[in-house]
């Protein structure tokens, strides 16, 4: 099974194995967490805890904003910008847990909540960034920044805060703000649906093979496919479903399963089938088709950009990037495109030569790329990816990362076992600096 690593930033830092001690009759999000570094007490959190916590978090957040707005003192960095940074603690507490689980260890109930919450959260944040009274306080501080004796860090925070308000529509009139709020809510809803459709199609396809279909596959790849089939058997709810996976081998569009198969399998028909299952996700004219969603999102983004005073969505997004305009992006892409295309054609020619030498009567297609590029690599450089793979096991890669960070920055890692996590395969490390202190 694909291993899961519980990470906060790079690694979740914990320093002891203290267990959660929560009142089971009270929502876990409404209690102080006594776990190391306030690690979420995953075993105590139930799906039904999220919505009440989100609602209370949003209520508290708006109440905190109202306190800032009603402050009769002259707006200052301390009573407005700093206070704004302190708001939303409960909401952030809930959202950090929910967002991570919804993306890494989801279930139908979490997905249902995600669809319900997306427009709610979008509307909530718009209530803050489009609040005229709040923005007026921020704007007054911005206009008086030269005489405020702010540190560089405070200047940066003030600039970023104002920019967030402006780019969210704070300078628009009331009618435009209403339009932006409606558009943001719809985009949020569509974006969630798009992602869930993509996940459903990724998880929904299985290439179930017999032993006779495994031509060219290494022992490691075969073993992983056999284990995947065994896991499917364990999860099966009926005898007929169990029989479906008995003595079989399963490959999926997940890259860790797909790439080794595309590289090693000599069965071109099966390579094509698995490859197409990946590239056609969301484009199968079924209940999880994303074509109409993509069109709707593009139109809404364009409409929002126009309301904000930009020609296109690309112009709006690029304003915050190194390249500021679509023309600058296209110019850079053209510079890269020509040499990249030349190199790609040369690589295809090398692959085609190998296929021709084997007596094949087809032109190299997308699903052939991994297989024949590996053969070219072996012929030209005597480099066998299958021979390297045992050295790149998960544990070896993790240890390599830890050794590198230790050499560069003196960080030390100690795996912790006696702490609750969100999944049985999750692994947790304590991280300390070279002097033994926690970061």
Predicted ranges, named:
Residues 6-9:
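Sec-dependent N-terminal signal peptides
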Residues 12-15:
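C-terminal motif of bacterial Sec signal peptides marking the signal peptidase cleavage site
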Residues 57-66, 113-128, 187-198, 206-208, ...:
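Charged, low-complexity, helix-prone segments enriched in Lys/Glu/Asp/Gln
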Residues 157, 186-189, 196, 200-251, ...:
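Active-site-proximal, well-structured secondary-structure segments within enzyme catalytic domains
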Residues 17-19:
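Sec-dependent signal peptide cleavage junction
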Residues 1-4:
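Positively charged n-region of N-terminal signal peptides that target proteins for export
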Residues 21-225, 232-234:
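N-terminal helix-rich structural modules
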Residues 34-49, 98-117, 139-182, 250-292, ...:
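Short His/Asp/Glu-rich catalytic/ion-coordination signatures at enzyme active sites or charged loops
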């Amino acid at each position: 099974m694909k291993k899961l690593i519980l990470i906060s930033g790079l690694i979740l830092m914990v320093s002891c194995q203290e267990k959660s001690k929560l009142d089971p009759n009270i929502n876990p999000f409404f209690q102080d967490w006594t776990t190391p570094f306030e690690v979420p007490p995953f075993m105590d959190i139930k799906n039904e805890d999220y919505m009440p916590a989100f609602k209370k978090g949003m209520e508290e957040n708006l109440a905190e904003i109202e306190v800032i707005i009603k402050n009769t003192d002259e707006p200052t960095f301390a009573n407005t910008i700093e206070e704004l940074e302190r708001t939303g603690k409960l909401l952030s507490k809930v959202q950090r847990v929910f967002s991570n689980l919804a993306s890494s260890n989801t279930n139908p109930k979490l997905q249902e909540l995600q669809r319900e919450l997306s427009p709610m959260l979008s509307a909530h944040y718009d209530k803050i960034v489009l609040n005229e009274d709040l923005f007026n306080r921020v704007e007054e501080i911005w206009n008086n920044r030269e005489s405020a004796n702010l540190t560089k860090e405070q200047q940066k925070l003030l600039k970023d805060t104002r920019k967030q308000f402006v780019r969210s529509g704070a300078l628009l009139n009331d009618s435009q703000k209403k339009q932006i709020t409606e558009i943001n809510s719809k985009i949020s809803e569509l974006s969630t649906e798009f992602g869930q459709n993509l996940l459903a199609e990724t998880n929904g396809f299985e290439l179930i093979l017999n032993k006779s279909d495994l031509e060219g596959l290494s022992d490691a790849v075969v073993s992983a496919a056999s284990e995947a089939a065994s896991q499917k058997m364990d999860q099966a709810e009926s005898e007929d479903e169990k029989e479906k996976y008995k003595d079989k081998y399963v490959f999926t569009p997940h890259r860790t399963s797909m790439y080794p198969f595309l590289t090693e399998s000599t069965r071109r028909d099966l390579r094509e089938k698995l490859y197409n299952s990946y590239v056609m996700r969301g484009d199968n004219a079924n209940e999880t088709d994303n074509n109409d969603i993509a069109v709707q999102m593009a139109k809404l983004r364009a409409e929002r950009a126009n309301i904000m005073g930009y020609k296109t969505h690309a112009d709006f997004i690029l304003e915050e990037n190194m390249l500021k305009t679509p023309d600058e992006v296209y110019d850079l892409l053209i510079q890269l495109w020509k040499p990249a295309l030349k190199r790609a054609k040369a690589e295809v020619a090398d692959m085609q030569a190998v296929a021709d030498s084997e007596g094949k009567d087809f032109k190299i297609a997308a699903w052939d790329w991994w297989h024949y590029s590996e053969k070219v690599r072996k012929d030209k450089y005597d480099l066998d990816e299958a021979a390297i793979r045992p050295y790149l096991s998960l544990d070896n890669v993790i240890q390599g990362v830890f050794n590198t960070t230790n050499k560069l920055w003196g960080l030390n890692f100690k795996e912790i076992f006696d702490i609750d996590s969100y999944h049985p395969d999750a692994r947790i490390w304590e991280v300390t600096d070279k002097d033994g202190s926690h970061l």
